[in-house]
C-alpha cells in the first residue's frame, strides 16, 4: 500500500512539473533569431491567447517555437 501511494505521488509530481514547464515555455517571447533561414513555425502569443504563425531564421530560438499548429495548441492549450 505504501509503495502504491509513493508511485502515485511521484506520478502526480511529474505531471505537475511537466505542466508548469510547458506553461512557462508558452510565456516566452517569439524569437525569430539572427540567422536567415525561412522556416514556417508557430508560437503561442500570450497576449491574444492563440498560436500564431511566424518565420523562424533557424538559430538562437527558444521553446516557444513549434513546427505545427497542432503541437503549439497541444502544449499551450490554445
From Swiss-Prot:
Q: List the disulfide bonds.
A: 26-76, 35-59, 51-72
At which residues is there a site annotated May bind to TRPV1 subunit B? 23, 28, 60
Q: From the Swiss-Prot or TrEMBL record, what is one GO molecular function term?
A: serine-type endopeptidase inhibitor activity
Q: Name one GO biological process term.
A: venom-mediated suppression of sensory perception of pain in another organism
Residues of the signal peptide: 1-22
Query: Residue limits of the BPTI/Kunitz inhibitor domain?
Result: 26-76
Sites marked Reactive bond for trypsin: 36-37
Annotated keywords: Disulfide bond, Ion channel impairing toxin, Nematocyst, Neurotoxin, Protease inhibitor, Secreted, Serine protease inhibitor, Signal, Toxin
The record describes the protein's role as: This protease inhibitor shows two different activities, it inhibits both the capsaicin receptor TRPV1 and serine proteases. It partially (max 50%) and reversibly inhibits capsaicin-induced response of TRPV1 (IC(50)=54 nM), a receptor of the pain pathway. The second activity is a weak inhibition of trypsin and chymotrypsin activity (Ki=1 uM and Ki=5 uM, respectively). In vivo, it shows antinociceptive and analgesic activities. It significantly prolongs tail-flick latency and reduces capsaicin-induced acute pain.
Give the protein name, as stated in the record: TauPI-stichotoxin-Hcr2b
Q: Record the organism.
A: Radianthus crispa
Amino acid at each position: 500500500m505504501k509503495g502504491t501511494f509513493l508511485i502515485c505521488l511521484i506520478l502526480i509530481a511529474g505531471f505537475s512539473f511537466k505542466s508548469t514547464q510547458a506553461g512557462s515555455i508558452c510565456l516566452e517571447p517569439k524569437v525569430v533569431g539572427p540567422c536567415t533561414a525561412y522556416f514556417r513555425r508557430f508560437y503561442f502569443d500570450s497576449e491574444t491567447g492563440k498560436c500564431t504563425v511566424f518565420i523562424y531564421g533557424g538559430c538562437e530560438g527558444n521553446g516557444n517555437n513549434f513546427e505545427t499548429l497542432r503541437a503549439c495548441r497541444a502544449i499551450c492549450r490554445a
